[in-house]
């Protein structure tokens, strides 16, 4: 067994190698899972609900992220078909994973008759935490970097970051680090500040994720030099714009009623026994 044989490999057992990329992605996913599981227990959900969700969700998310990357790099992969499955070498586009995961989540929670918006609130902030870990996988693979910078740019950075960002004979801007930090700040903001002071209705934390990550990725993508392109445009920036728009509309309540798949009559009794038809009030509030 060889631990840390090089910057890309975490551990090797003979010909079997486990990449840092995989370890960091799974570490992020595990942290997100544990946080979600703790909250779901507080909400009274059976723990097996999340257990049944997370494994297929992780698989589908990675599959969607890889498919998105391969589609927009088809000029290369059409001649290297055997490399399509080589995700340990990098090449996962988060937007593809988000789209695939969103579709699966709609199906899963509707089938289980669980509020999608409530799960949206629960899961999406933790996705930012998982993404913060995942960007360090890009660091180990020397990808998701920006333009050429001078050596003095790294004066106040740790040596291991400076050394790893020396790519193709030049120092590169560590855009992976910028996004990782922004994702971590987004997780903390949504979880501890937004939820406490600005949360109005179910789904708001999920929609805030879309706004936060949309802005973060749009800005940082403009600094990168290895972006996926379509018709001369950066695909990540186009999708990020869509995320921002949908997120803002969601925070305004535009999609709220669409996710109440089956409205049930809701009534409240006042203390004096008066029956109050409060269905509209409850749906507008929660």
Feature locations, PLM:
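A feature for loop-to-transmembrane-helix boundaries and adjacent hydrophobic helices
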Residues: 1-263
């Amino acid at each position: 067994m060889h631990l840390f044989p090089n910057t890309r490999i975490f551990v090797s057992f003979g010909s079997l190698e486990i990449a840092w990329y995989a370890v960091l992605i799974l570490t992020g996913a595990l942290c997100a899972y544990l946080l979600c599981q703790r909250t779901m227990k507080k909400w009274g959900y059976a723990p097996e609900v999340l257990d049944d969700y997370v494994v297929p969700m992780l698989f589908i998310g990675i599959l969607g992220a890889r498919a998105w990357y391969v589609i927009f790099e088809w000029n290369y992969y059409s001649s290297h078909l055997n490399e399509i499955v080589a995700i340990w070498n990098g090449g996962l586009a988060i937007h593809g994973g988000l789209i695939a995961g969103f579709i699966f989540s709609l199906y899963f929670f509707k089938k289980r008759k669980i509020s999608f918006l409530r799960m949206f609130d629960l899961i999406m902030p933790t996705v930012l935490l998982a993404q913060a870990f995942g960007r360090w996988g890009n660091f180990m693979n020397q990808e998701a970097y920006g333009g050429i910078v001078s050596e003095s740019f790294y004066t106040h950075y740790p040596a291991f970051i400076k050394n790893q960002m020396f790519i193709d004979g030049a120092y590169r801007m560590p855009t992976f680090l910028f996004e990782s930090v922004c994702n971590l700040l987004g997780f903390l903001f949504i979880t501890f500040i937004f939820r406490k002071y600005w949360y109005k209705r179910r789904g708001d934390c999920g929609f805030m994720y879309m706004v936060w990550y949309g802005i973060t990725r749009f800005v940082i993508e403009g600094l990168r030099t290895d972006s996926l392109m379509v018709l001369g445009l950066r695909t990540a920036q186009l999708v990020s714009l869509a995320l921002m728009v949908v997120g803002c509309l969601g925070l305004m309540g535009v999609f709220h009623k669409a996710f109440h798949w089956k409205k049930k009559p809701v009534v409240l009794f006042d203390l004096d026994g008066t029956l109050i038809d409060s269905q509209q009030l409850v749906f507008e509030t929660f």
